Structure formats: C-alpha cells, structure tokens
Amino acid sequence: MLFRSPVFPYQMTTRYEITSHVTGTITIDGETTVVDCPGQRDHSWGVRDWWQFPWNWTAGHLDDGTSFHAARSIIPQLELFATGYTIAPDGTFAEAAGDEIVVAEVVTDPETLPVSSRQRIGEVEFTSRPVGHAPVLLVAPDGRVARFPRAMCRYETPDGRRGTGWTEYNWPEGWPDLLHRA
C-alpha cells in the first residue's frame, strides 16, 4: 500500500494524524482487490486510560477534496483537549483547537451506538450518519468499563458536500448522561 499525503503529518506529543490517498492491492485467500481511495493514518505511542473521561475522534473526506480530523473531550463545562485540522481542496492546511471543534447533538440508540451527530471542525460543519459499526467493550483490570462505539460514517455539510469517514466515541461508565437517545 502506498499512502500519499498532501501535507506533513499533524503531530501531537504522543501521536500523529495524517490524511492520505491510498493506492495498492490487498490479497486475501488468493483474491486480489485494488485499493484507490482517501484514507487516514494515525498512530499513538502514549498511555491511554480509556476509563477516565468521554471523548470523540473523527476523520473524513468530502467529495470536493476537503479532508478533516479532530479529537476532543466531551465533558460539559470542562475542556481537557480539543485539537484537529482541515485541509482545503487546494491543499491549504488549517489547524483547529478549542471552541473551533464542536461535537453536538450526539444521538445514540439503546446500545449506545451513534445514530447521528452534528459536528464542526474549523470552518467545516457537517452531520454524520453511521453506516456500519465496530463497537468495542473495554474492561480495565480493576473492572471499570468503557463503551467504545466506532462507526464508518457518511457526512453531509449544510452546502451539500458529501463524504465518508470514521468516528469514534469513548463512553466510560459512571459519567452523566451526555447523550440524546433515539
């Protein structure tokens, strides 16, 4: 696989994020599939306490060539972190932080899987609708539990652009009900 990126990886202290275009082939059980699509690479070297607080991670690509990524804590009246970026179709990179990254109106089903949400990263506002889920139940050695619903999503902006990507939520048990239930 070849990952071509329009910009240098967005680096944080213990991780990096990079929007890419992925080409190559994958062979499984003798069947080869050609890959030619937008992608996202991220890697983390840091220690993660999944049971500490709720957060959201989102990355996607729109049909006009816009790419975006953000991660932020989701705690009412408390901001622990909020960081991300957008890349315009012409390759212009814009960092986003703090109140430039909004996760709002997260609607979940009875299993705590996301049904929809409204988000904004910098100047890019969009709604997300999951089309496939890959949830993970995280259990700490001391018994604490966090639900980690991950979803492949379709995105749509108010001006009609559409795209696809991935969103993840981390919902540790014991936090107040921060969600809208479907």
Show where each model-derived region lies:
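Structured soluble/peripheral alpha/beta segments that form catalytic or ligand/cofactor-binding pockets
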Residues: M1-A182
